[in-house]
Regions:
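Residues lining hydrophobic/aromatic ligand-binding pockets adjacent to catalytic sites
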Residues: 1-244
Length: 244
């Protein structure tokens, strides 16, 4: 009897990620939260910022991080700057811009609990939120594994391959863009099948916009569609009032 395929997806532990991120969780047997790679010394990335609809426009919402260190550090060592009132600021922005969304009363208390997680660790904060959101939209959060807990080293493609092998994966679910012939050959040489995600962003009803804005945090879909229909959107299913 042939061995069953074990699909692995790998991504940094993002801050309230977009729908495509959760589609990867839905399609993978193991979803590895890559907290063992470097956080940029300057600026930010999807680990501490994401876009919400604010004043009818896609705007960055950011969790500030401590910048007192003098070297590049892995995400797992990055601390949130809890000396600033960023939690209050984000919640006020949500109240102001999503207060009239159809599912605001259901989602806001849930979101408040996630944002008010008192941890200093950006990894702990994001991993907890990703797991809670996965549960809320009926995804299996037990498939989430932190990369830093695995015996896997290397850089770039080599690190990805070693992480896939560390959990016994036989296939790697990657984003829609091609990784390049030479990189693909590395996976093939290790007997790992490449699967391209090709997630088609759904168009769902949004509050206070004339034209749909894609690529926002899952929070936008939750506020406008609720837990159940957001789960359907993640799975690629249609919901009332939405179109692909």
């Amino acid at each position: 009897m042939p061995e069953s395929k074990k699909v692995v997806a790998i991504h940094q532990p993002n801050f309230f990620p977009w729908l495509g991120y959760f589609n990867k969780i839905a399609r993978a047997d193991f979803f590895l939260l890559m907290d063992n790679v470097q956080f940029p010394k300057k600026g930010g990335n999807w680990s501490n910022r994401v876009r919400f609809l604010i004043n009818r426009q896609p705007m960055w919402v950011t969790m500030p991080v401590v910048r007192s260190y003098h070297s590049v550090r892995p995400i797992k060592e990055i601390q949130l700057d809890n000396n600033t009132p960023w939690r209050t600021k984000i919640l006020r922005a949500v109240q102001t811009n999503y207060g009239r969304a159809p599912f605001y009363e259901q989602i806001f208390p849930f979101l408040t609990d996630l944002i008010n997680n008192p941890t200093d660790s950006i990894t702990d904060h994001n991993c907890f939120a990703i797991a809670a959101m996965s549960d809320a939209v009926k995804l299996d959060a037990s498939r989430l594994i932190r990369g830093s807990t695995l015996d896997a080293e290397g850089h770039s493609t080599d690190l990805l391959i070693n992480m896939v092998k560390a959990v016994g994966g036989t296939a790697y679910l990657c984003g829609g863009g091609a990784s390049g012939y030479q990189e693909d050959e590395k996976f093939a040489a290790e007997g790992i099948e490449l699967i391209y995600q090709n997630f088609q962003h759904p168009v769902y009803p949004q509050t206070n916009v004339d034209e749909f804005v894609p690529g926002l945090s899952i929070v936008d879909a939750l506020m406008n569609c609720g837990f159940e229909d957001t789960g359907r959107l993640i799975a690629g299913e249609s919901i009332e009032g939405a179109h692909g």
